[in-house]
Amino acid sequence: MGKAAYHLPVMVREVVAWLVRRAGIYVDGTLGGGGHSLAILRALRDKGLEKGSFLIGIDQDSFAIAEAERTLASFRERTRLVQGNFREIADIVSTLRENQLRGMEVAGILLDLGVSSFQIDTSERGFSYLRSGPLDMRMEPDEGQSAADIVNTFEERELADIFFRFGEEKKSRRIASAICSWRNERGVIRGTQDLAAIVRSVVSVPDQQIKSLSRIFQALRIAVNDELGALESALKEGAASLSPQGRMAVMSYHSIEDRMVKHYFRTLAADDWGPKGVALREPLHKAAFTLVTRKALIAGDDEVNENSRARSAKMRVIERKMYSGEVSESDS
């Protein structure tokens, strides 16, 4: 496997400032190389909160777990790294709270969405059109169907739907048609460069090619890993896991994810006034959460200049109120 490195963590100062406020359990649901987790642990130490705190790191990529173990070695006694999907966050946290972390409250949860630079830069993973490699795109390489399975077996209508829904690609139908034509005329689509060539054959303008390639690869990655389904579950389970005054921060990198986060957070923070047209003096149920950030936070110019990945990042933060409130099925 080619040598690659994990990206600089995005918006670290904002994560620490808006998330780390008191002692307790902190959950990094998208561990990656451990950059955000390291910043959280250092902030807890510097604020004198280390003794009553613990960090749980979750990632489904075994390579990420191994890298994070090295990054967080100096905090080994106060960390637990779990290989799993962040959609399982509630089960992972509750299991640890019943045993090792009994009596501790969940003070903060961080979700940094999207694919890491390490995965993009590792050609064997097939995440990038800029590198020649197999069309894999699985976050955990040994599980589930790959991108190659999708582009070589799905019907034209199914491919177009994936490209439009998950990539918002305007030429989704034409690209899907070109993929099927390639399969009929030339056989199996074998790697990232075959797929890139197909997209370029449909989109002739160079600037538009780059955008369409990004959208198509994004759409396939989302489909392969059921990223939106996982995000929906993670938002619900994360919110349900928070203790009173606990906060959840979510960082997204494209509009589809950000809309999901924005909508769900607003739903959690809204009082239930019952059916429309029924006048009530008080809500049927008061919201158990409050929006900490009314608008998405973005990276500063200095960070964007140093780290291009920060350019598209948006962070939203929500907090559970002091009184107890359950997240019901209707909240999702």
UniProtKB/Swiss-Prot annotation:
Its EC number is 2.1.1.199. It is found in: Cytoplasm. It catalyses: cytidine(1402) in 16S rRNA + S-adenosyl-L-methionine = N(4)-methylcytidine(1402) in 16S rRNA + S-adenosyl-L-homocysteine + H(+). One of its GO terms (biological process) is rRNA base methylation. GO terms for molecular function: rRNA (cytosine-N4-)-methyltransferase activity. Keywords: Cytoplasm, Methyltransferase, rRNA processing, S-adenosyl-L-methionine, Transferase. The keyword Oxidoreductase does not apply. S-adenosyl-L-methionine binds at G34, G35, H36, D59, F86, D112, Q119. One of its GO terms (cellular component) is cytoplasm. It holds the Pfam family Methyltransf_5. The keyword Cell cycle does not apply. Belongs to the methyltransferase superfamily. RsmH family. This is Ribosomal RNA small subunit methyltransferase H. It comes from Chlorobium phaeobacteroides (strain BS1).
